[in-house]
Design a protein with these regions (language model features):
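Conserved tyrosine-mediated DNA breakage-rejoining catalytic core shared by Y-recombinases
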Residues: 88, 123, 132-165
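N-terminal core-binding DNA-recognition domain of tyrosine recombinases/integrases
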Residues: 1-4, 13-89, 103-104
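Short, charged phosphate-coordinating catalytic segments
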Residues: 65-74, 118-140
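Catalytic-site neighborhood detector that most strongly recognizes the C-terminal catalytic loop/helix
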Residues: 147-151, 246-271
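A short, basic/aromatic helix-end/turn motif that makes direct DNA contacts
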Residues: 132-138, 233-235, 243-249, 257-260
Length: 274
């Protein structure tokens, strides 16, 4: 189990204890009425969006599935809980953006976090995987890495940009929390001038909220993986190769990662109709 997964379990159970408010509940008490009230509580008390609620309730349901494997009696109503999930407003960076980041003058600490993000952009891995690369993972000109989340093996080409970054830090990458990393990343991307306005949509039950944010505000550690996949796809790398590098096993999942920027749309249109 990844460190991020452990933190996610802690978050939902902290909210559960807050909802429980000292009451003693048994697993059989977690019926449909409980889940209706719990979901309302999470929306009203914590202002969770539908996507965040979907993720956190999945962790809660996974825990109940685990209880079943241990022969504990659970109320099976939890299996009927259905929540909406929407495609999130996400972005990817361009090769030009990566050059801007590479040439940015930063303090030692911010420089490290910038490099760590670029390692993700050039490897296509999840943060939990690209933040723990080791020399022992190298075979020839490949990094062979087993994903912490899926336990599948990825074959990651040790391209010059990636090798240079890893060598720069002597392959000694300090492990930090994803949230702390994201905080640093937003500061770095703001300094890089990623100020273009982006429309974001959040769903909370029947309420739809549209916000205008700066591009740097919605860049996270996961943007690195999405950036690799998008750039690889735009440069005609076959999907099955992208999947082998990233460890993605479902083609539908791969499609959700692909983002097309407006410049590429214009380029293709001009090439077709000029």
């Amino acid at each position: 189990m990844t460190k991020e997964s452990v933190e996610s379990y802690k978050k939902i159970f902290k909210k559960f204890l807050s909802f429980e408010d000292g009451k003693i509940l048994e697993l059989m008490d977690l019926d449909n009425d409980f889940f209706v009230d719990f979901i309302v509580f999470l929306r009203e008390e914590y202002k969770l969006s539908d996507n965040t609620l979907y993720r956190q309730m999945n962790f809660f349901k996974t825990f109940l599935n685990w209880c079943n494997t241990k022969s504990m009696q659970t109320n099976k109503d939890y299996k009927k809980v259905k929540l909406n999930k929407y495609n999130p407003d996400t972005i990817s960076l361009t090769k030009e953006d990566l050059k801007v980041l590479e040439n940015l003058e930063l303090s030692k600490s911010k420089s490290y976090h910038r490099d760590l993000f670029l390692i993700g952009c050039y490897s296509g891995q999840r943060f939990s995987d690209y933040s723990v690369f080791e020399r022992s993972d190298v075979q020839g000109n490949m990094i062979i890495k087993r994903s912490e989340k899926t336990e599948s093996h990825s074959f990651i080409p040790l391209i010059p940009q990636l090798k240079s970054l890893l060598d720069k830090h002597d392959w000694n990458l300090t492990i930090i929390s994803g949230q702390k990393f994201n905080d640093y990343l937003k500061i770095i991307c703001q300094k890089a001038g990623f100020d273009e306005e982006v429309k974001t949509t959040k769903y909370m039950g029947s309420k739809k909220t549209v916000e205008i944010k700066k591009r740097w505000e919605i860049i996270t550690s996961h943007t690195a993986r999405r950036t690799f996949i998008t750039i690889a796809s735009e440069n005609l790398m076959p999907d099955h190769i992208i999947m082998k590098i990233t460890g993605i096993q479902d083609p539908k999942t791969l499609q959700r990662y692909k983002k097309v920027n407006k410049e590429k749309v214009m380029d293709y249109a001009l090439n077709v109709f000029s």
